[in-house]
């Protein structure tokens, strides 16, 4: 808890809260404790545009605050999901902001320099995640879904190269993949360079298979077809093909991409 309070952005926001509000980080022990406190609580999480590199120690660009849950909770307990159940008013500047985001290749992590992908053949992208990540547990996923995702990508795209984008934590923090060694070494599969940015991945892959990774939302912003296998904030609004095993959390309406960007990147972050 002390480490959370030392976070400069948390510290600034916490000073504005009632002293009776309990707070914690996402669904880590501090956040779960705050949520179970029986009173008002605030949960902090990484935003859609976080930092240069993943992990701890680097400068962080922003933070999200949620009075109900986290945006990757399949139960739908989140201020973001609650807002998306209603109308989203798109501000006049938002289309230009989204276009600028796309043109600059901005992502959650921004450590990669632009790369020349002309030597790659256009193909299909599978997005890996870090084994044990909270969005897997709370996003209605288990590891059998990564097997389904992998098998579907190969079966549905028999003539296309299959690329896998591993999570940056695999390079920076030695986190394990959600795919087996056999899958990663499959003859039709190529592991993309760790320092290839999401924006460059989307230049060579216009179809993307994803669990709950935020790269799925980034793929939508870059105009890709997105197939999901878990329930994150961008699934279920009519923009994605959804194959999650768990029942879809209630979605009261559909949204355009610009409405989703307004809600997730402007209002919530």
Regions found by a protein language model. Give the residues of each.
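Catalytic-core helical/loop segments in enzymes performing group transfer/polymerization on anionic/lipid-linked
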Residues: 1-269
């Amino acid at each position: 808890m002390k480490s959370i309070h030392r976070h400069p952005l948390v510290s600034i926001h916490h000073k504005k809260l009632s002293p009776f509000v309990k707070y914690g980080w996402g669904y880590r022990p501090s956040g779960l404790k705050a949520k179970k406190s029986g009173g008002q609580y605030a949960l902090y999480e990484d935003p859609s545009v976080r930092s240069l590199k993943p992990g701890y120690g680097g400068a962080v660009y922003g933070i999200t605050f949620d009075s109900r849950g986290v945006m990757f909770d399949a139960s739908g307990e989140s201020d973001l999901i609650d807002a998306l159940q209603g109308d989203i008013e798109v501000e006049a500047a938002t289309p230009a902001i989204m276009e600028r985001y796309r043109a600059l290749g901005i992502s959650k992590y921004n450590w990669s320099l632009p790369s020349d992908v002309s030597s790659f053949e256009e193909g299909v992208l599978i997005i890996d995640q870090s084994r044990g990540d909270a969005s897997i547990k709370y996003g209605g996923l288990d590891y059998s879904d990564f097997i389904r995702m992998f098998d579907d990508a190969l079966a549905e795209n028999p003539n296309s190269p299959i690329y896998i984008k591993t999570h940056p934590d695999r390079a920076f923090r030695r986190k394990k993949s959600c795919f087996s060694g056999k899958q990663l070494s499959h003859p039709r599969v190529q592991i993309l360079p760790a320092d290839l940015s999401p924006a460059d991945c989307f230049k060579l892959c216009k179809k993307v298979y994803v669990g709950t990774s935020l790269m799925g939302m980034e793929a939508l912003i870059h105009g890709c077809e997105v197939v999901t296998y878990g329930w994150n904030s961008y699934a279920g609004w009519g923009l994605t093909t959804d194959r999650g095993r768990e029942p879809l959390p209630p979605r009261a309406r559909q949204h355009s991409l610009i409405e989703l960007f307004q809600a997730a990147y402007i209002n919530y972050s």
